């Protein structure tokens, strides 16, 4: 035949290519242009294995037959446009392979098809011309089921056709006479009219598609629901006369708050409204809340979520009653973060500074941190208002030497024991924590009792009184015998603090008992002569102190009259150089000791040294006859102390 020379041109060692995986589409074509192929098949062909003799006698014929079978199957899978452009050679090869398979491969002889040997030929591909005009058909289509439609390759959207559920519902409603149907009628129309639903009308198999019908009726705007006039009847479903959206509308889930323009507009309006409200609050500066909101650290600037956490933290130094600066803000001041080195410059101002700021409370003064630094800070104090208790006495004549907590200037911490125990001879009865009291501001250096401080410091004139919190029975001090004031007598000293706007030393719970012997070495005749000239007769002094009445929330007045007769001028010469401890002034400020001469006119001294209204703090005149009547029951009215300190009356006589 004419195709025989072309069969010879095929390589005798050519073997069928292995079929790629079925999931790949389109399948790759074998390379026919190559004369030699290095591709080998893992398994020999079935025809060659079945007929080894024929394969041995006609290797080229069997190879051509297998290649023709492979090409016939491949032609059914390939697209028409991908078909090779050499139809003549392919057709000749296929024909030669068919002839070889019919004569030698199956019958074992060289008879042609005209010899009468009838064998079932393999399925032949259509000619190249018609093949290019038809869509590709899978291998299964070559069988007897080639006429049935295939779901995967058809253009149908659903199993029943290209119509959607909405289209089917539309056709059902339009087919009715009244152009309206109930839900059950739509179900019936589906089962009767659509072949796919004919066998799915029962309740078990209709749950899925009936649910889809109800879903589409509610989803699409082209269907409207009309209330049925009859009682107990379901509603009518009609087509929307205004048209509505045809087909499927986008899913409602797609129109979320993130991508829907309606929600975006509403959010933008809400944001603008919020911004306008905030700007209005900032503009209304007259309201107190706006002033605090402008403050970055104010509670108004915090959100409600952060306010609880923010308000729970309240540092010790930021309480309303114990702020150094006097500000009643719960916010920590920037000075609270200072180190110990910086606290000194803040707490202890220079000597020239005015003492008009608010004094610290006792709870803040008794801070252990401030107690540690007091010794160093006391050495740096040069203000006249600082504590300069210098009761002179010889070391061998001290009777009782106990540390006394004395006060320093305002804005300082509570005092630690004094550094010089050979010089300070004063004791303490107790230090009890007291309730926070309203602290009054002090004036300048010359505060309420600057003159009285010097008056009590007269050399040898006053034997200072011992005072402290007394029990309700009000112990009265015994008068001091004039004979006690001898060169070797003992003088009991007391720090008396008196002022209308101040508190007693350590709030009246501490008494400084200054016991000192009176040596005869340091004598000052000038002081004694002047004192005897001014006070030629005994001056009884009635001093009202502030005791504590246990069980009562009020302060009582205990008058402790102490008769201090003036001794002989020669005896006073032995006492002249030893002035007793000056009285506490203000918030425990001690007056300076002085060795200067006492003014002859005590009235003039008080007028000169005092810068306050004496009548507002002293009910009686200072120099009323022969007595000094000090009444301080109006100091700290209705003030109660938490502890009652029992103090006995001390009296020292020469032994």
Swiss-Prot record:
Biased composition (Low complexity): 33-63
Annotated motif Nuclear localization signal, positions: 251-253
InterPro entries documented for this protein: FH_FOXO1, Fork_head_dom, FOXO-TAD, FOXO_KIX-bd, TF_fork_head_CS_2, WH-like_DNA-bd_sf, WH_DNA-bd_sf
Effect of substituting residue 265 to R: Inhibits interaction with ATG7 and FOXO1-acetylation-induced autophagic cell death
Annotated Polar residues bias: 309-326, 507-534
Effect on the protein of changing residue 423 to R: Abolished deacetylation by SIRT6
GO cellular component, one term: nucleus
Tissue specificity: Expressed in umbilical endothelial cells (at protein level). Abundantly expressed in skeletal muscle and ovary, with lower expression in the heart, placenta, lung, liver, pancreas, spleen, testis and small intestine. Weakly expressed in the brain, thymus, prostate and mucosal lining of the colon.
Changes after translation: Phosphorylation by NLK promotes nuclear export and inhibits the transcriptional activity. In response to growth factors, phosphorylation on Thr-24, Ser-256 and Ser-322 by PKB/AKT1 promotes nuclear export and inactivation of transactivational activity. Phosphorylation on Thr-24 is required for binding 14-3-3 proteins. Phosphorylation of Ser-256 decreases DNA-binding activity and promotes the phosphorylation of Thr-24 and Ser-319, permitting phosphorylation of Ser-322 and Ser-325, probably by CDK1, leading to nuclear exclusion and loss of function.
Outcome of swapping residue 24 to A: Abolishes PKB/AKT1-mediated phosphorylation but does not prevent phosphorylation of Ser-256 or Ser-319. Also inhibits binding of 14-3-3 proteins. Nuclear in unstimulated cells, and little export to cytoplasm on IGF1 stimulation
Pfam families in alphabetical order: Forkhead, FOXO-TAD, FOXO_KIX_bdg
DNA-binding region: 159-235
Keyword Ubl conjugation: yes
Region annotation (Required for interaction with RUNX2) ranges: 363-459
Result when mutating residue 274 to R: Inhibits interaction with ATG7 and FOXO1-acetylation-induced autophagic cell death
Organism domain of life: Eukaryota
Induction, as annotated: Expression is regulated by KRIT1. Levels of expression also regulated by FOXC1 which binds to a conserved element in the FOXO1 promoter.
MF terms (GO), sorted A to Z: beta-catenin binding; chromatin binding; chromatin DNA binding; DNA-binding transcription activator activity, RNA polymerase II-specific; DNA-binding transcription factor activity; DNA-binding transcription factor activity, RNA polymerase II-specific; DNA-binding transcription repressor activity, RNA polymerase II-specific; nucleic acid binding
Biological role: Transcription factor that is the main target of insulin signaling and regulates metabolic homeostasis in response to oxidative stress. Binds to the insulin response element (IRE) with consensus sequence 5'-TT[G/A]TTTTG-3' and the related Daf-16 family binding element (DBE) with consensus sequence 5'-TT[G/A]TTTAC-3'. Activity suppressed by insulin. Main regulator of redox balance and osteoblast numbers and controls bone mass. Orchestrates the endocrine function of the skeleton in regulating glucose metabolism.
Disease in which the protein is involved: Rhabdomyosarcoma 2: A form of rhabdomyosarcoma, a highly malignant tumor of striated muscle derived from primitive mesenchymal cells and exhibiting differentiation along rhabdomyoblastic lines. Rhabdomyosarcoma is one of the most frequently occurring soft tissue sarcomas and the most common in children. It occurs in four forms: alveolar, pleomorphic, embryonal and botryoidal rhabdomyosarcomas.
Protein name from the UniProt record: Forkhead box protein O1
Gene behind this protein: FOXO1
């Amino acid at each position: 035949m004419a195709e025989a020379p072309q069969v010879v041109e095929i390589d005798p060692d050519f073997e069928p290519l292995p079929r790629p995986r079925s999931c790949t589409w389109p399948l790759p074509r074998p390379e026919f242009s190559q004369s030699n192929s290095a591709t080998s098949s893992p398994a020999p062909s079935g025809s060659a294995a079945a007929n080894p003799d024929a394969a041995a006698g006609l290797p080229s014929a069997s190879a051509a037959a297998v290649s023709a079978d492979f090409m016939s199957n491949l032609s059914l899978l390939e697209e028409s446009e991908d078909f090779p452009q050499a139809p003549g050679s392919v057709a000749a090869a296929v024909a030669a392979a068919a002839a070889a398979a019919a004569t030698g491969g199956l019958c074992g002889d060289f008879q042609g098809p005209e010899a009468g040997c009838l064998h079932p030929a393999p399925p032949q591909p259509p000619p190249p011309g018609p093949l290019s005009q038809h869509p590709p058909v899978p291998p299964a289509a070559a069988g007897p089921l080639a006429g049935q439609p295939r779901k995967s390759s058809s253009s149908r959207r659903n199993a029943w056709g290209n119509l959607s559920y909405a289209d089917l519902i539309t056709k059902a409603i339009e087919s009715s006479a009244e152009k309206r149907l109930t839900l059950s009628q739509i179900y019936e129309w589906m089962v009767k009219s659509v072949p796919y639903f004919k066998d799915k009308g029962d309740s078990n198999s209709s749950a899925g598609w009936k649910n889809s019908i109800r879903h589409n009726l509610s989803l699409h705007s082209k269907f409207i629901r009309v209330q049925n006039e009859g009682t107990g009847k379901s509603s009518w479903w009609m087509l929307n006369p205004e048209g509505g959206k045809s087909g499927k509308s986008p899913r409602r889930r797609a129109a979320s708050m993130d991508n829907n323009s309606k929600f975006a507009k509403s959010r933008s309006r809400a944001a603008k409204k919020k911004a306008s409200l905030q700007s209005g609050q900032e503009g209304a500066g007259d309201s107190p809340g706006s002033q605090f909101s402008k403050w970055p650290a104010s509670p108004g600037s915090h959100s409600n979520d952060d306010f609880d956490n923010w308000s729970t933290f309240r540092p010790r130094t930021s309480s309303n009653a114990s702020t150094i600066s006097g500000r009643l803000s719960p916010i920590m001041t920037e000075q609270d973060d200072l180190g110990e080195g910086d606290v000194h410059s803040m707490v202890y101002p220079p000597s020239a500074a005015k003492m008009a700021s608010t004094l610290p409370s006792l709870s803040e003064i008794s801070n252990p941190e401030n107690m540690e630094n007091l010794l160093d800070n006391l050495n740096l104090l040069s203000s006249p208002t600082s504590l300069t208790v210098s009761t002179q006495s010889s070391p061998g004549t001290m009777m009782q030497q106990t540390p006394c907590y004395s006060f320093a200037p305002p804005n300082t911490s509570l005092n630690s024991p004094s550094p010089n125990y050979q010089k300070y001879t004063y004791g303490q009865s107790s230090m009890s924590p007291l309730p926070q009291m309203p602290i009054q501001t002090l004036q300048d250096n010359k505060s309420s009792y600057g003159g009285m401080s010097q008056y009590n410091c007269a050399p040898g004139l006053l034997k200072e009184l011992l005072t402290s919190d007394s029990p309700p029975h009000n112990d009265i001090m015994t008068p001091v015998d004039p004979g006690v004031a001898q060169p070797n007598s003992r003088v009991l000293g007391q720090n008396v603090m008196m002022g209308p706007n101040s508190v007693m030393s350590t709030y009246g719970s501490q008494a400084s008992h200054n016991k000192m012997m009176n040596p005869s070495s340091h004598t000052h005749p000038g002081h004694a002569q002047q004192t005897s000239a001014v006070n030629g007769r005994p001056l009884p002094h009635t001093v009202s102190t502030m005791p504590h009445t246990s069980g009562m929330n009020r302060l009582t007045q205990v008058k402790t009259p102490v008769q201090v007769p003036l001794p002989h001028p020669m005896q006073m010469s032995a006492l002249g150089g030893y002035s007793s401890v000056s009285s506490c002034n203000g918030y425990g400020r001690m007056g300076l000791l002085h060795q200067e001469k006492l003014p002859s006119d005590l009235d003039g001294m008080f007028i000169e040294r005092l810068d306050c209204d004496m009548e507002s703090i002293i009910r009686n005149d200072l120099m009323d006859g022969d007595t000094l009547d000090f009444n301080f029951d109006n100091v700290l009215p209705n003030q109660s102390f938490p502890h009652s300190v029992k103090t006995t009356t001390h009296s020292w006589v020469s032994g």
